[in-house]
Swiss-Prot record:
SUPFAM superfamilies in alphabetical order: a domain/subunit of cytochrome bc1 complex (Ubiquinol-cytochrome c reductase) (SSF81648), Transmembrane di-heme cytochromes (SSF81342)
Compartments where located: Mitochondrion inner membrane
Organism this protein belongs to: Euryzygomatomys spinosus (Guiara)
UniProt-recorded name of the protein: Cytochrome b
Entry GO terms, CC: mitochondrial inner membrane; respiratory chain complex III
Cysteine disulfide partners in this protein: none
């Protein structure tokens, strides 16, 4: 008798990816975030699809259509807040997932890591364009400020900005194209996720020890399916608490005011998950310099494999590197806080110091600490 699960052309792929997949026996809860990100992506696509059924991408009716969704559509408020807060959960898990990769040296899987960084850029672009769609004050001014950064590019900058805007300011053309891109990008992200997994399954998962685990593998199902379900339940619980008790906790009150090109909000700032990068952008007085620092603050992730000087892969047995990584985490929290503060003393200075230390820790201190640990271990 043939086993359909193992022989059917389509089911066989699922079987090799989620059922009979050999997984290390010691991977911790930090390895749960990959599956949670997959669930978040599915949730965002489903809620987004239902929102798109009622939303109109037109400057005169966009804000009203979102209000209509919340007031008149059956459970529209739930769909809208699940989508908005689902994005926040997505980024929390993304940052945990990346942090796990840095801590345990998962970046040595070069292809998987680089595709992951590209995925991060794509998710950030999608989230930014999604924030513009409700056409509130922060949507409009956020779009104006961030797209205007491209004008810092020498020679082609101003033309490029007008090309993206589809006119001489952020208007109907901008909103329509942002909606089109916001709709299509998650599907491209889904395809990229499949490539991300394809490369991961070429090498197999890393594990907390950073050692080769070929001699001690267990099947993914039932061990890690049940573990992922536990993570999923905790995620749903957290998300539901956020949606049902304080749906606007992470949002901006300014976005409940319809977009007005004649009235600038006192503090223009992006969603909380971009604040660290926004703080780095603002900490440099020069426009082009700020834009470069902004891009490099994310692009620097691609340098991690090249900056890995340690003889051990994981930080599990490297306390000095661990300490430095947690300092980096604290630094990012400081940057996130600064990004939400007005541009005045002492926040400017704190932001500049935090930005410098962010790049110094990654580019100088971490590789040097790894070399020192090698020396201390006489490796």
């Amino acid at each position: 008798m043939t086993n359909t699960r193992k022989n059917h052309p389509l089911i066989k792929i699922i079987n090799h990816s989620f059922i009979d997949l050999p997984a290390p026996s010691n991977i911790s809860a930090w390895w749960n975030f990959g599956s949670l990100l997959g669930v978040c992506l599915a949730l965002q696509i489903i809620t987004g699809l239902f929102l798109a059924m009622h939303y109109t991408a037109d400057t005169t009716t966009a804000f009203s259509s979102v209000t209509h969704i919340c007031r008149d559509v059956n459970y529209g408020w739930l769909i809208r807040y699940a989508h908005a807060n689902g994005a926040s959960m997505f980024f929390i898990f993304l940052y945990f997932h990346i942090g796990r990769g840095i801590y345990y040296g998962s970046y040595t899987f070069m292809e998987t890591w680089n595709i992951g960084v590209i995925l991060l850029f794509m998710v950030m672009a999608t989230a930014f364009m999604g924030y513009v769609l409700p056409w509130g004050q922060m949507s409009f001014w956020g779009a104006t400020v961030i797209t205007n950064l491209l004008s810092a590019i020498p020679y082609i900058g101003p033309t490029l900005v007008e090309w993206i805007w589809g006119g001489f300011s952020v208007d109907k053309a901008t909103l329509t194209r942002f909606f089109a891109f916001h709709f299509i990008l998650p599907f491209i992200i889904t395809a990229m996720v499949m490539i991300h997994l394809l490369f991961l399954h070429e090498s197999g998962s890393n594990n907390p020890s950073g050692l080769n685990s070929d001699s001690d593998k267990i099947p993914f199902h039932p061990y890690y399916t049940i573990k992922d379900i536990l993570g999923l339940l905790l995620m749903i619980l957290t998300l539901l608490m956020l949606i049902l008790f304080s749906p606007d906790l992470l949002g901006d009150p300014d976005n409940y005011t319809p977009a007005n090109p004649l009235n600038t909000p006192p503090h223009i700032k992006p969603e909380w998950y971009f604040l660290f990068a926004y703080a780095i952008l603002r900490s440099i007085p020069n426009k082009l310099g700020g834009v470069l620092a902004l891009v490099l603050s994310i692009l620097i992730l691609m340098l991690f494999p090249a900056l890995h000087t340690a003889k051990q892969r994981s930080m599990t047995f490297r306390p000095m590197s661990q300490c430095l990584l947690w300092i980096l985490v604290a630094n990012l929290i400081i940057l996130t806080w600064i990004g939400g503060q007005p541009v005045e003393y002492p926040f400017i200075t704190i932001g500049q110091l935090a930005s410098i230390s962010y790049f110094c820790i990654i580019l100088i201190l971490m590789p040097m600490t790894s070399l020192m640990e090698n020396h201390l271990l006489k490796w």
